[in-house]
Design a protein with these regions (language model features):
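Short beta-edge/loop segments at beta->alpha junctions of small alpha/beta modules
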Residues: 1-70, 92, 97
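Short secondary-structure capping/turn segments at boundaries of alpha-helices and beta-strands
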Residues: 72-75
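Phosphate-handling catalytic interfaces
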Residues: 77-175
Length: 175
């Protein structure tokens, strides 16, 4: 995609049209070739831009924690890209979500919510995310929902890490 990079690393078809008709047709060819992904009508991004894009979780879902597929991807425990941002909130909490980006909320009990939360800087955003050990426990806990292949990939990736903390993993598994 030859067009300029715009806010959130996405390109608008209207902005490309301003560069000229040739740039717009080049964008459409890029989509047809698979180099560019159509996010929604009039919004496009490359696969690399999608992989690098992180939202400000605290601004969209105050008190939310990145979890499941999103956390597994950040920690490098899975090779698949999440289709949505997976964010944990305390059970019973009502949250109004934007239309874009796609966010899936997971309501966690108050006793389990704070276990394994750490803070990381990702794409210049301060993000609350579950640590690797909590992510592995969640993969095993939700194995019937996420699939046995994903669960096995997360567990095997964690066990292959040199800095794994098995005692913390077993502590989380007991809770």
């Amino acid at each position: 995609m030859e067009g300029k990079r715009y806010s959130n690393s996405f390109t608008s078809s209207e902005m490309v049209k301003e560069e000229g008709r040739a740039a717009y047709y080049k964008l459409l060819d890029s989509v047809r070739d698979g180099d560019t992904v159509r996010i929604k009508r009039g919004v496009y991004a490359t696969a690399e831009q999608l992989a690098d894009t992180m939202i400000d979780v605290e601004a969209i879902v105050p008190g939310g924690v990145l979890c499941l597929f999103s956390a597994w991807n950040v920690h490098g425990l899975t090779t698949s890209l999440p289709q949505a941002y997976h964010i944990a909130v305390k059970r019973g909490r009502k949250v109004t979500l934007p239309v874009f980006p796609k966010i899936e909320l997971h309501h966690i009990t108050n006793t389990m919510f704070d276990i394994g939360v750490e803070e990381q800087i990702i794409s210049s955003y301060r993000i609350h995310i579950y640590n690797k050990e909590r992510c592995v426990c969640d993969a095993v806990k939700y194995r019937n929902k996420v699939g046995m292949d994903v669960c096995a990939e997360v567990v095997n990736s964690y066990l292959a890490l040199p800095g794994r903390n098995l005692s913390l993993l077993f502590d989380y598994a007991d809770k």
